[in-house]
Amino acid sequence: MKNITTRQFSVLADCGKIYQFMLDIYERDWKNGVPAPFFEYAFSSFAYWMDITYSYKNCIWEDHGEIVAFCFYEAPVTDIYFSLKPGYEELAPAMISYADEHMSIKGENIQLILFGGQDALMKAAMEKGYYQASETIDMQFDFEEMLNYPLPEGFHFVKPEEYDIDKVSKCCWKGFDHEQNEGPWEHQYEQSNYLLKVAPHATWEHAVIIADEKGEYACYAGMWWTPQNKLAYMEPLCTIPEYRNMGLASAALSELYRRMKKG
């Protein structure tokens, strides 16, 4: 007999438990919720874009002490996600009600992020008065196919043992257009990439970095290898403005494909 209890999420105590829960319920189509590296990448980015101030609002459902459901926000804090173990679909109405009543920050409207296959949650959301406002597509590449875009002349792949986290931070600063909007690189948020590098399940060594002839990092593709789910989760991906539309990102993805296929 099930014995369902709820409790609030604790950053210090629960990140590892939630990661394992997401590993255990993972399905390729995300019908049970986001993959584990999605969560860890976000919560390891608290020094930069992820606001964990309100993480106490995140809620965990347990059955005899085992995590079976999780409601949480990412970025922005108004985007609410749901992870639900198969066989516990009856919790969907309670999860939607919890989000509706407790996940709003200072009265802001929330939006529920649901994936195809999360039928029980979708039904509960509609019964609560929610409706589908938009749709996006998350792409996955099957390694049974081939990815083989060439590296443009004048660029090279940086060897993993030579990765420079300071250069990665500068590449991300420029690659996500912060230089245009906030000024030149002055080591802003450099701690963010360090925290990502040392995250519990980070696989920094599998990232792909492309540099120009002067050694400046031109393109960066992060990689969170999750062997338990046979998932190569790429996050982030950026190219600095002066080298865009040259095929660097395609070349980086091709190199990731070659490396991860071997793994």
Where in the sequence are the language-model features?
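A short beta-loop-alpha structural element at the N-terminal edge
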Residues: 4-20, 29, 156-170
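Conserved donor-binding loop and adjoining core beta-sheet/short helix segment
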Residues: 7, 11-15, 25-105, 213, ...
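Flexible, substrate/cofactor-facing loop regions flanked by secondary structure
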Residues: 38-39, 147, 151-232
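A structural microfeature
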Residues: 69, 134-135, 219, 249
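Acyl-donor-binding surface of acyltransferase catalytic domains
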Residues: 74-154
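Conserved acyl-CoA
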Residues: 94-109, 242, 251-263
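Generic hydrophobic alpha-helical scaffold/packing signal
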Residues: 172, 207, 221-224, 235, ...
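Flexible nucleotide-binding loop
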Residues: 246
